């Protein structure tokens, strides 16, 4: 029943249910509501579960059926089980460190592969691993975002292929094991920066590899590196050297701040011409020097370099072709030496309407690099204005020196400062002496501007450096002679050059360089510049000169200044040319603009210069250097600046101004001083000191003589132009033209300044290497070498002086630089060849030329021959050429500066201009000698000499040998000019002996004078081949022995000089007449050539310096020559010879080696006894001709020797080194020389004995006399026995005193030897080494020093002086005692010599004091000599 009852299908039951349900539904029921709510929640959770189980509803939709609760629950259970199983597996493999995917944080949701890239993205870098070999083991894919390389491209490639080469070392350091890098522990992690190569764009790749290389770009990446990863190491493989890095870009804030850049814009037309300039940005920055920056940038951008088209042209072409262009980076230097890196971006602007190109817009971006210049950068840069190329700017000293070179000059500048400062201090009196003139003031700037960095060492080491002239002259070398100390005061131009030259000084450069210091005369500066160019020395110094600012600044001070018209023309042309030569420099380009314009002439000049430079080995290279270019430019500019004060317009006073302005530091005081001098002296001084060029000299001469300067190419303005034009055509031709002009100009005897033949001298010949155009027009620039010297030197005396100076410079510098070159026998041959060429030219031009002109020409030729030999020895060394020019300048300066001391009155009578020229020449040479060889004492004393001193000495000398002076007036003037300068060198020397020396010099004539000047300076170096060496030899004692060997001159030379001089001094008037006759006879070249052949000059030249020296010695004095050998060969011989040579050397030092470069000469003499013969060689041609004249007069040397013996005192006064000696030597052949030497030896032995006795007796007296002489130094008896010895040989002829001590040395009677023995202190130095102090020079001491040492009394005083003169004194003192002891026999001369020695010592102490001393000593010796040598002194006293 129940079952049935329960059966739902039972109808009876169904109905009641329905009823119940309906009844229940009629009202609310809590039970129903609860059930419903539960169902709803169940469905909701199931849906949520389904969402969790299935990734998305799409998966649900993908199901064939709509998931019900059961399906959802089923899937849920399935996944839960999977998770459980996964957890179990993970737990089994679980490491100590819980895995992220197992972490309860839910990180398992993040894809493991995405985590690395996400981290690299956050770091802004890429990941790479490098093994020990530097190969990339792994690199992340995002490397493409940074380096544009694909992952595959870098995998297994060397990491160094993408690293900048500069970062390889840093990367290796981090890659190597820590134990290898620093030997100590290192953190496993470290950070470093490196530059990585960015793959070029596809476009760049398509352009080609070159383009890629050109456009390589590096991205600076900061690398975080970890080495020695522990986990990897433990895996069994050693990856400890593996580097794991994350590289990221360096944040902007961490990137180095680039140096601030400046920019300005320019607009150019389609032809590249700048139409507008916008410097708004530059002005806004207001950085100092922005105007100069813009100017120099444009100059550099538009200047040509290395024969290529300029940046601007190439850039402009590229812009027109492509529409835009970026120039390569180029550098240039500002005036302060700051180097600027610049590049230019340009775009072609087109018309919007026609699309036609309208203009080019250029943006010049400039970045100033750290100033490379140092010490004097500001000084030099500001003063010079323009600087050299940036590379040159690296040397602040040099820049300061030149002021124009920011770099190169800078280095020299620092040296310069030392050179100027050191030498000044060293010089003491010398510096002070020059300080008086404006020179010292200029020196401060010159320190920055002058290429004296190289000089510094030489200056300090060499007497020349110690000498006032050198010390100050060098600083003033950049300055115009007016502002500069006179050449003599400034010091020997050749010394300064040699100081620079040795380095190459000049290169040097800078020595420029150069050393242009002493050659403050235009010639000297030019020579230094060219010398620096030729030597390549430093003349990077020169480049600064080329800078426009520098140019402007230095033009006024340039010794190279030419006449105003000439300067004006040349100012633009030269500047252009200099720029053309150094067109490479942007600065030079600017300078060109400043000069006036960039003209074709500039190109031509550059070409000429290039060709000329090619001719002169290395000169072209030097010229190519911007520094050299700047130096030449500066020289030229100096000339331009000198324009304001045209030399022709200036009176003799002006000339003196220029020469003395260095002295007085103001042209007015100099002018006043010059005015006090006679017109001839003034002209000579001015020509020597102020004349920037031959044209200037010609102008001055014309003013003095009333002649027109327009006669020849030497005319001031036109002459310069002509010279410029001619020189480019052919240096030789131009020289010939100049020589013709000078010869035709009829250099008056009195007006040595008129003697322009110097323009033709071998200097020019050698100079052909330089552009002829530059030689003359640019001579101001190139003056440093040869052509300019010719231009600078007056047509007559200046040329003669120039020749002598060139010889001296060559001798000094070449010997210093090339000791061997001096000794080359080829020198004589070259000199002879040059002489012949010049003589031929002269002969061609001689027709219609006055005898005087021809003489001058011959002198010049002879000198040129000497110079040529020297140059040949030097093998075309421009520095030597420069040196001669420098010497010439110094001569000029000396004339102004020293002439007052030496030849105010003394030589005024005979031929003041000549004497002055000679004095200036000799003085300059002396100064040069002082500067070059280190005969500081001599140089110093010489400055001490006053015009009055010189005057007294010169006047005394002239009165003593007035006839010779008159007879040989002009020749002597030439010679005297130099000898006079030399004479002051020997303050202790007797005035009379100096006079005697003058007489022989006068007898020798202009040509002889030149020769003598060259010779006396080198008298000890008589060998012509050694002429280049004489100065150097004197400077270099080591060279002396070779010189002694080279020529028997060491002993014979001084004696021969004396002998020759005695011949000349037989009768001043007769000698002068004979000289005139001889010159007239020799007027034509053929005649001269025949005479030379008759005299055996060609053979002598071919034989070499030794032979030439001997020949010269013989002509000068058989006795002297013969005595010389004994002196050199034997100590006693040296004494005797010293006695004679002492006087001769003493005079020679003062006169030639000593006079012009007292200290220098002495040292030179010391350095090589043969130097004097070398000097003699210079004088050789003149001496030979003079000898011919003498022969015409006496037809034999014996009469001459007898007169010399009789006039031994006169010979002393004349000084053996004087041309007279040389003259006699010329005619003497080898046999004669040998015989004379033997005679001299025997005489010397006898004289030595007598001298020793006399010296022993008179040593004390002489010492007292020396003191007196020192006190009397200022009295004007600047001519000590030494001087007397030089000039004393001629005096010897008249005076027996000289033979007393030196008769054996020379043909002079023993009396002469005795008298000269008093001078032996100097003679001793002359006989072996220098004309003045050859005997002592043989010992290494300068002629003056030697002479001083010759007499015991003098020796002691000399020792004292030696103390005063550290450089020359010690040498003097060393040789002085022996010589003095030897010469004690010549009591008179001994006393004189003692005085002279004192004077020499004083010279050691200071040139001025020495010069003063010389005058005093002369008087003292004359007055106090009366001891044993008083009789000998008699004739000299008579002359006095």
Curated annotation (Swiss-Prot):
Residues 511-521, 555-564, 607-619, 1292-1306 have a biased composition (Polar residues). Residues 1-40, 388-409, 453-521, 539-571, 583-656, 704-731, 948-970, 1287-1306 are annotated as: Disordered. Residues 112-183 form the PAS domain. CDD domains: bHLH-PAS_NCoA2_SRC2 (cd18950), PAS (cd00130). It comes from the Eukaryota. A motif (LXXLL motif 3) lies at residues 739-743. A motif (LXXLL motif 2) lies at residues 684-688. Pfam families: bHLH_NCOA, DUF1518, DUF4927, NCOA_u2, Nuc_rec_co-act, PAS, PAS_11, SRC-1. The keyword Amino-acid biosynthesis does not apply. A motif (LXXLL motif 1) lies at residues 631-635. Coiled coil: none annotated. The keyword Transcription regulation applies. PANTHER family: NUCLEAR RECEPTOR COACTIVATOR (PTHR10684), NUCLEAR RECEPTOR COACTIVATOR 2 (PTHR10684:SF2). Belongs to the SRC/p160 nuclear receptor coactivator family. This is Nuclear receptor coactivator 2. It comes from Xenopus tropicalis (Western clawed frog).
């Amino acid at each position: 029943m129940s079952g049935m009852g329960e059966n739902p299908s039972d109808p009876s039951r169904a109905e009641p249910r329905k009823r119940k349900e309906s009844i229940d539904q009629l009202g609310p029921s809590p039970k129903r509501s609860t059930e419903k709510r539960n169902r709803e929640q169940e469905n909701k959770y199931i849906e949520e579960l389904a969402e969790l189980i299935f990734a998305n509803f799409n998966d649900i939709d993908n199901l064939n059926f709509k998931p019900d609760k059961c399906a959802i629950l089923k899937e849920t259970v399935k996944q839960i089980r999977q998770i459980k199983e996964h957890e179990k597996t993970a737990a089994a493999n679980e490491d100590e460190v819980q895995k992220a995917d197992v972490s309860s944080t839910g990180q398992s949701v993040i894809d493991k592969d995405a985590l690395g890239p996400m981290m690299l993205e956050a770091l802004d870098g890429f990941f790479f691993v490098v093994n020990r070999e530097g190969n990339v083991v792994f690199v992340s894919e995002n490397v493409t975002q940074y380096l544009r390389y694909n992952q595959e491209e870098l995998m297994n490639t060397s990491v160094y292929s993408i690293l900048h080469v500069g970062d390889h070392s840093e990367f290796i350091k981090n890659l190597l094991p820590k134990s290898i890098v620093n030997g100590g522990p290192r953190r496993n992690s470290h950070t470093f920066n490196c530059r990585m190569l960015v793959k070029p764009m596809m476009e760049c790749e398509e352009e080609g590899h070159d383009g890629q290389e050109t456009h390589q770009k590096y991205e600076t990446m900061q690398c975080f590196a970890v080495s020695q990863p522990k986990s990897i190491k433990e895996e069994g493989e050693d990856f400890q050297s593996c580097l794991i890095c994350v590289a990221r870009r360096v944040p902007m804030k961490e990137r180095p701040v680039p140096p601030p850049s400046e920019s300005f814009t320019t607009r150019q037309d389609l032809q590249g011409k700048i139409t507008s300039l916008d410097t708004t940005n530059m002005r806004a920055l207001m950085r100092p020097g922005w105007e100069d920056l813009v100017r120099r940038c444009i100059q550099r951008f538009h200047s040509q370099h290395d024969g290529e088209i300029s940046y601007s042209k190439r850039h402009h072409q590229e812009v027109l072709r492509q529409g835009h262009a970026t120039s390569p980076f180029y550098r240039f230097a500002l005036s302060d030496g700051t180097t600027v890196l610049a590049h230019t971006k340009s775009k072609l602007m087109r018309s919007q309407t026609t699309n036609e190109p309208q203009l080019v817009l250029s943006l010049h971006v400039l970045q100033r690099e750290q100033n490379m210049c140092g010490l004097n950068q500001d000084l030099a840069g500001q003063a010079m204005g323009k600087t050299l190329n940036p590379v040159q700017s690296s040397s602040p000293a040099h820049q300061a020196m030149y002021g124009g070179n920011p770099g190169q000059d800078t280095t020299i500048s620092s040296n310069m400062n030392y050179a100027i400062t050191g030498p000044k201090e060293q010089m003491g009196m010398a510096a002070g002496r020059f300080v008086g003139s404006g020179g010292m003031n200029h020196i401060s700037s010159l320190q920055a501007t002058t290429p004296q960095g190289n000089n510094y060492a030489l200056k300090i080491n060499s007497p020349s450096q110690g000498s006032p002239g050198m010390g100050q002259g060098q600083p003033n070398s950049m300055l115009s002679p007016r502002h500069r100390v006179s050449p003599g005061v400034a010091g020997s131009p050749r010394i300064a050059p040699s100081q620079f030259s040795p380095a190459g000084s000049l290169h040097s450069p800078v020595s420029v360089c150069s050393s242009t210091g002493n050659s403050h005369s235009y010639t000297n500066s030019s020579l230094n510049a060219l010398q620096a160019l030729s030597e390549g020395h430093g003349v990077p110094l020169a480049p600064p000169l080329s800078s426009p600012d520098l140019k402007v600044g230095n033009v006024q001070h340039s010794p190279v200044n030419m006449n105003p018209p000439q300067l004006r023309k040349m100012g633009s042309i030269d500047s252009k040319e200099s720029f053309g030569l150094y067109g490479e420099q942007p600065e030079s380009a600017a300078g060109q603009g400043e000069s006036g314009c960039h003209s074709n002439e500039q190109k031509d000049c550059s070409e000429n210069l290039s060709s000329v430079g090619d001719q002169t080995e290395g000169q072209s290279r030097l010229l190519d250097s911007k520094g050299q270019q700047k130096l030449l430019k500066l020289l030229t500019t100096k000339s331009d600046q000198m324009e304001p004060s045209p030399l022709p317009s200036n009176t003799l006073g002006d000339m003196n101004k220029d020469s003395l302005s260095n002295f007085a530091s103001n042209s007015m005081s100099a002018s006043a001083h010059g005015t006090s001098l006679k017109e001839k002296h003034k002209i000579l001084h001015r020509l020597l000191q102020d004349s920037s060029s031959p044209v200037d000299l010609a102008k001055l001469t014309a003013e003095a003589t009333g002649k027109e300067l327009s006669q020849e190419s030497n005319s001031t303005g036109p002459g310069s132009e002509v010279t410029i034009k001619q020189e480019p055509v052919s240096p030789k031709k131009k020289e010939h033209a100049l020589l013709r002009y000078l010869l035709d100009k009829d250099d008056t005897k009195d007006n040595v300044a008129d003697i322009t033949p110097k323009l033709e001298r071998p200097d020019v010949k050698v100079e052909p290497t330089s552009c002829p155009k530059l030689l003359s027009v640019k001579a101001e620039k190139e003056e440093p070498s040869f052509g300019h010297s010719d231009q600078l030197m007056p047509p007559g005396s200046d040329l003669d002086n120039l020749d002598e100076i060139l010889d001296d410079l060559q001798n000094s510098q070449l010997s210093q630089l090339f000791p061997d070159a001096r000794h080359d026998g080829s020198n004589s041959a070259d000199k002879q060849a040059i002489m012949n060429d010049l003589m031929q030219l002269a002969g061609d031009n001689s027709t219609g030329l006055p005898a005087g002109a021809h003489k001058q020409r011959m002198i010049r030729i002879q000198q040129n021959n000497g110079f040529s030999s020297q140059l040949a020895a030097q093998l075309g060394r421009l520095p030597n050429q420069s040196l001669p020019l420098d010497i010439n300048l110094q001569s000029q300066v000396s004339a102004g500066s020293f002439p007052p001391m030496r030849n105010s009155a003394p030589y005024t009578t005979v031929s003041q201009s000549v004497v002055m020229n000679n004095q200036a020449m000799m003085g300059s040479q002396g100064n040069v000698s002082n500067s070059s060889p280190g005969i500081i004492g001599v140089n110093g004393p010489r400055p001490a000499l006053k015009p009055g001193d010189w005057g007294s000495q010169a006047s005394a000398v002239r009165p003593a040998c007035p006839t010779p002076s008159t007879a040989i007036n002009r020749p002597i003037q030439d010679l005297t000019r130099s000898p006079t300068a030399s004479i002051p060198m020997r303050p202790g020397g007797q005035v009379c002996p100096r006079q005697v020396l003058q007489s022989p010099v006068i007898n020798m004539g202009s040509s002889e004078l030149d020769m003598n000047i060259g010779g006396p300076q080198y008298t000890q170096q008589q060998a012509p081949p050694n002429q280049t060496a004489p100065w150097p030899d004197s400077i270099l004692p080591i060279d002396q022995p070779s010189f002694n060997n080279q020529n028997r001159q060491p002993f014979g030379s001084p004696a021969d000089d004396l002998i020759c001089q005695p011949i000349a001094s037989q009768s001043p008037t007769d000698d002068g007449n004979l000289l005139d006759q001889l010159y007239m006879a020799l007027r034509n070249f053929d005649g001269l050539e025949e005479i030379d052949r008759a005299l055996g000059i060609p053979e002598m030249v071919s034989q070499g310096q030794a032979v030439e020296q001997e020949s010269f010695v013989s002509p000068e004095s058989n006795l002297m020559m013969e005595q010389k050998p004994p002196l050199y060969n034997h100590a006693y011989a040296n004494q005797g010879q010293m006695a004679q040579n002492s006087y001769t050397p003493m005079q020679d030092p003062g006169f030639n080696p000593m006079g012009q470069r007292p200290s220098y000469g002495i040292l030179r003499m010391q350095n090589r006894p043969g130097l004097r013969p070398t000097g003699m060689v210079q004088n050789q041609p003149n001496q030979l001709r003079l000898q011919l004249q003498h022969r015409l007069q006496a037809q034999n040397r014996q009469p001459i020797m007898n007169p010399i013996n009789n006039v031994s005192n006169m010979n002393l006064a004349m000084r053996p080194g004087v041309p007279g000696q040389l003259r006699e030597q010329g005619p003497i052949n080898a046999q004669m020389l040998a015989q004379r030497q033997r005679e001299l030896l025997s005489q010397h032995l006898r004289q030595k004995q007598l001298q020793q006795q006399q010296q022993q007796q008179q040593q004390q007296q002489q010492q007292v006399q020396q003191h007196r002489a020192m006190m009397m130094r200022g009295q004007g008896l600047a001519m000590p026995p030494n001087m007397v010895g030089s000039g004393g040989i001629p005096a010897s002829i008249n005076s027996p005193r000289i033979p007393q001590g030196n008769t054996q040395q020379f043909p002079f009677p023993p009396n002469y030897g005795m008298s000269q023995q008093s001078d032996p202190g100097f003679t001793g130095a002359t006989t072996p080494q220098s004309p003045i102090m050859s005997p002592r020079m043989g010992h290494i001491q300068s002629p003056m020093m030697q002479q001083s040492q010759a007499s015991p009394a003098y020796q002691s005083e000399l020792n004292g002086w030696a103390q005063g003169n550290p450089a020359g004194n010690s040498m003097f003192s060393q040789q002085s005692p022996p010589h003095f002891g030897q010469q004690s026999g010549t009591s008179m001369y001994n006393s004189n010599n003692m005085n002279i020695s004192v004077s020499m010592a004083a010279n050691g102490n200071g040139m001025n004091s020495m010069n003063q001393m010389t005058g005093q000593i002369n008087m003292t010796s004359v007055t106090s000599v009366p001891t044993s040598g008083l009789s000998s002194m008699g004739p000299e006293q008579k002359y006095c």
